[in-house]
């Protein structure tokens, strides 16, 4: 989960086409690096999943509550228009989105459950709170599933094959092939596959983040998704863990510590 948060922070200065930097030789962290809505919602979903105790209806309500609470606590984190309206709606119904927000916030689901089937079920619940379009659900499930597979010892070829066979994403592309024509887009179907490819082509945790940002596009969300996967596969260097936590406010750090305690108890 902390890898996803760092990915968000690393990608934040390069979001949107006019800020994209399509090379890997950028400062990993700078004065412009900051957490965004991706981090806020990652923390919110983690707390909601813990409160939900693996029960679908309870989890739906808990995730909905936490997302609205944290979203209002951080009103200027960078939410989209539809999501912002949902945060303040009297009746917060899902609105059929297939945006990549469902995938950016789901990292904790890849860690909190003991089976792939349960991981997929809970990822679906977290998406359906807002992103109940099939592509929105698929993006969240694919992200959580890859995190689960990465942390449970599966190889990159195994992960690639699973994604292709289960979700139908095209994994037979390279970062060099994607980069020239890739632009800012916020759909799951045009962000999640690219984020997974950035991980598959990497040689380390940091290299995965650099791959993701170098593609361009919705760089903070892309790197957030990639970072969550890369942490599960490679681990995360202690100095980067420390630097990430230093850049977070106390309540988000507390949400992370609650998550870490829960995965330590399993």
Q: What are the functions of these language-model segments?
A:
Residues 1-266:
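Structured, active/binding-site neighborhoods that engage oxygen-rich ligands
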């Amino acid at each position: 989960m902390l890898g996803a948060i760092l990915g968000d922070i690393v990608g934040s200065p390069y979001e949107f086409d006019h800020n994209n930097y399509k090379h890997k030789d950028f400062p990993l962290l700078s004065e412009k690096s900051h957490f965004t809505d991706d981090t806020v919602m990652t923390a919110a979903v983690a707390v909601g999943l813990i409160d939900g105790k693996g029960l679908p209806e309870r989890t739906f309500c808990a995730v909905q509550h936490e997302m609205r609470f944290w979203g209002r606590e951080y009103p200027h984190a960078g939410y989209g228009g539809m999501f912002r309206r949902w945060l303040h709606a009297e009746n917060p119904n899902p609105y059929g989105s297939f945006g990549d927000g469902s995938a950016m916030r789901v990292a904790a689901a890849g860690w909190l459950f003991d089976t792939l089937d349960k991981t997929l079920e809970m990822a679906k619940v977290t998406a359906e709170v807002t992103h109940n379009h099939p592509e929105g659900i698929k993006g969240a499930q694919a992200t959580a599933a890859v995190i689960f597979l990465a942390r449970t010892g599966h190889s990159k070829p195994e992960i690639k094959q699973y994604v292709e066979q289960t979700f139908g994403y095209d994994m037979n592309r390279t970062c060099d092939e994607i980069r020239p024509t890739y632009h800012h887009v916020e759909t799951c179907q045009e962000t999640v596959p690219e984020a997974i490819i950035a991980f598959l082509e990497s040689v380390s945790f940091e290299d995965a983040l650099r791959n993701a940002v170098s593609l361009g596009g919705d760089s903070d969300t892309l790197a957030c998704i990639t970072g969550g996967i890369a942490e599960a596969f490679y681990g995360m260097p202690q100095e980067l863990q420390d630097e990430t936590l230093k850049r977070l406010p106390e309540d988000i750090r507390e949400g992370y510590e609650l998550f870490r305690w829960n995965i330590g108890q399993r």
